[in-house]
């Protein structure tokens, strides 16, 4: 028979049973009282297994509730967390069911909260938000429920702010190239073409001729250096082609090339 050599307080409502075998059992106060566990008490192997089984559920439930105290979680996240904590599968199921009964776990509410937070703190469109919810194990029905709070007006607000910020990053590009990259950027963020069109229309970006000229000069010089190994004619051809592909106007490109031709003839 194994004897309880010591009982000490652990975190929360838990206690540690120190056994003569050298093993330690973590039990809840409820189990301690229910089983009338005392120092010096002898425990059969059968009783030890019963205590372990009951403790797995209690410990797992307490861990899950503590995990939920920081923020809302999806059912999948709770299952994953309990698995990492080595809670046995049958207890994971019971724990999740108990949390649902206590209304501490609800994927529909999680979806709604996640969408509201994403709208307020991120630059992600509804498609990306939906994908993230799917990765968290949220059902399609609950995803669609959450997305009802991401209204068209909210999508437009987020897309517009994202586009405005992106345009500042692309100011060294041609106006045409900047618009294309910004559109692609918004698509990658998960916005629909309809919202992207409305966002760009509301911002009413206009070409700054001076900025366009500066962007062309900078890119043109970079390309000119990059093609130094070619003869003049081939270099002109490659630079013109690259600048055109980057969205610069033909007249500006031709002006840049003309200046290079003058330098070459001197």
From Swiss-Prot:
<comment type="similarity">
    <text>Belongs to the RecX family.</text>
</comment>
<dbReference type="Pfam" id="PF21981">
    <property type="entry name" value="RecX_HTH3"/>
</dbReference>
<dbReference type="InterPro" id="IPR003783">
    <property type="entry name" value="Regulatory_RecX"/>
</dbReference>
<dbReference type="GO" id="GO:0006282">
    <property type="term" value="P:regulation of DNA repair"/>
</dbReference>
<dbReference type="InterPro" id="IPR036388">
    <property type="entry name" value="WH-like_DNA-bd_sf"/>
</dbReference>
<dbReference type="Pfam" id="PF02631">
    <property type="entry name" value="RecX_HTH2"/>
</dbReference>
<dbReference type="InterPro" id="IPR053925">
    <property type="entry name" value="RecX_HTH_3rd"/>
</dbReference>
<dbReference type="Pfam" id="PF21982">
    <property type="entry name" value="RecX_HTH1"/>
</dbReference>
<dbReference type="InterPro" id="IPR053926">
    <property type="entry name" value="RecX_HTH_1st"/>
</dbReference>
<keyword id="KW-0963">Cytoplasm</keyword>
<protein>
    <recommendedName>
        <fullName>Regulatory protein RecX</fullName>
    </recommendedName>
</protein>
<dbReference type="GO" id="GO:0005737">
    <property type="term" value="C:cytoplasm"/>
</dbReference>
<dbReference type="InterPro" id="IPR053924">
    <property type="entry name" value="RecX_HTH_2nd"/>
</dbReference>
<comment type="function">
    <text>Modulates RecA activity.</text>
</comment>
